Amino acid sequence: MKRIHIFVLLTLSLIIISCGRNQEKLPTLVIHPHEEMPGNIDKKSYKSVFLAGTIDMGSGVDWQKDVAELFEKAPGNWVLFNPRQEFWDPSRENEMDYQVNWELSHLEDADFILMNFLPGSKSPITLLELGLFAKSGKLHVVCTDGFYRYDNVRITCAKYGVPVYASLTEAIGEIIR
């Protein structure tokens, strides 16, 4: 009986020690439409973030690239779902259906949604996504009073307890906490 107790104590000690070790930082993964997570990746090792926000049919600032660099430097392991396509071809058969369904699926599956409204943009799809996911508990919204519907965003976020930040850096700081 005493041997069993010693064995159990040693086993528990090893488990506790292994949990306390610093885990090696894995590269931040960025997944776009028409891409999948590599098969050899343990999805449980990563937290996922959907990058919702201004794209303006590709003419908007590529803020998603800056976000990827910030997450690469941040502690933790991250997979970013980025809906921006480098070569968007709306004439491709069923492309719009694919894109919308890809976005909705990844919005639902993500651990966090980082939503960025750029000043000077209209971002109608992002406003739609705000309405769809305001109650999800996953949203972190970046919006300044330079966005033409700032008050709508601010009021909606306040109603549902969604934090609003003035910068991507501030929002990411809260996500990685």
Sequence positions of predicted segments:
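Bacterial N-terminal signal peptides that target proteins for export
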Residues: 1-7
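Bacterial N-terminal signal peptides
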Residues: 8-15
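Conserved catalytic or regulatory cores that recognize and/or transform ribose-phosphate-containing ligands
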Residues: 19-177
